[in-house]
UniProtKB/Swiss-Prot annotation:
Gene: nagD
Molecular functions (GO terms): 5'-nucleotidase activity; magnesium ion binding; phosphatase activity
Catalytic-site annotation from UniProt: 9, 11
InterPro entries: HAD-like_sf, HAD-SF_hydro_IIA, HAD_sf
Catalytic activity: a ribonucleoside 5'-phosphate + H2O = a ribonucleoside + phosphate
This protein's UniProt keywords: Carbohydrate metabolism, Hydrolase, Magnesium, Metal-binding
Cofactor binding comment, as recorded: Magnesium. Can also use other divalent metal cations as manganese, cobalt or zinc.
Name of the molecule in the record: Ribonucleotide monophosphatase NagD
Gene3D superfamilies from the UniProt entry: HAD superfamily/HAD-like
Residues annotated to bind substrate: 11, 42-43, 176, 202-205
Source organism (scientific name): Escherichia coli (strain K12)
EC class of the enzyme, as a word: hydrolase
Marked site: Orients D-11 for proton transfer during catalytic turnover: 55
Cofactor(s) the protein needs: Mg(2+); Mn(2+); Co(2+); Zn(2+)
Length: 250
């Protein structure tokens, strides 16, 4: 297989918090110097592409904001294909910005969708409204299934849990491991799955999403998953490396 396109996860692969993984800059610049289409993909919906580019620049890694693709962007792309343009949103600036760009009206009056991302201001009233709207027919869409991040701060999946319990309806999660976000990233690059590799640190999200979308997969051991985890999974990554610094197949 000749790799012509690269999708790469961010946290645990290229960054640890706000510190670059050793070799990350060289890895990314090597891909860009070869002219390969690149998407840096994250499940977290709370930052814009420019926010992420600034985060990388602060860590000494210069990449354009155009290479970033977040679950908020993917959610907006998903919703562009659906009927209805009114949404009740549990989320913050980056998600709301993407929804406005997609032509949505943000409202708490008869919404077509309840869209959940991530926010630190989640409260009883938000949960009540979201559950009420979902129980009464609003379509339940969420950016990503992650329940928590580093330090156990609640993430989108945790915010959805109460709404799901009250309404009896499960959300459609746009982010990994859903193959939908991978196909959306491929569309962004105008790429084909059989010519694309995804690099990730999490077997249950990055590698599973790539596997389900028909991509070659690279697991790096600088983040969530370890070699011991591989034996518990029904699928295997195409390649395994200690970190991006050692990847030699791209």
């Amino acid at each position: 297989m000749t790799i012509k396109n690269v999708i790469c996860d961010i946290d645990g692969v290229l960054m640890h918090d706000n510190v670059a993984v050793p070799g990350a800059a060289e890895f990314l610049h090597g891909i860009m110097d070869k002219g390969l289409p690149l998407v840096l993909l994250t499940n977290y919906p709370s930052q814009t592409g420019q926010d992420l580019a600034n985060r990388f620049a602060t860590a000494g890694v210069d990449v354009p904001d155009s290479v970033f693709y977040t679950s908020a962007m993917a959610t907006a792309d998903f919703l562009r294909r659906q009927e209805g343009k009114k949404a009740y949103v549990v989320g913050e600036g980056a998600l709301i910005h993407e929804l406005y760009k997609a032509g949505f009206t943000i409202t708490d009056v008869n919404p077509d969708f309840v869209i959940v991302g991530e926010t630190r201001s989640y409260n009883w009233d938000m949960m009540h409204k979201a559950a009420y709207f979902v129980a009464n027919g609003a379509r339940f869409i969420a950016t990503n299934p992650d329940t928590h991040g580093r330090g156990f701060y609640p993430a989108c999946g945790a915010l959805c849990a109460g709404i799901e319990k009250i309404s009896g309806r499960k959300p459609f999660y746009v982010g990994k491991p859903s193959p939908w976000i991978i196909r959306a990233a491929l569309n962004k690059m105008q790429a084909h799955s059989e010519e694309t590799v995804i690099v990730g640190d999490n077997l249950r999200t990055d590698i599973l999403a790539g596997f389900q979308a028909g991509l070659e997969t690279i697991l790096v051991l600088s983040g969530v998953s370890s070699l011991d985890d591989i034996d518990s999974m029904p699928f295997r990554p195409s390649w395994i490396y200690p970190s991006v610094a050692e990847i030699d197949v791209i």
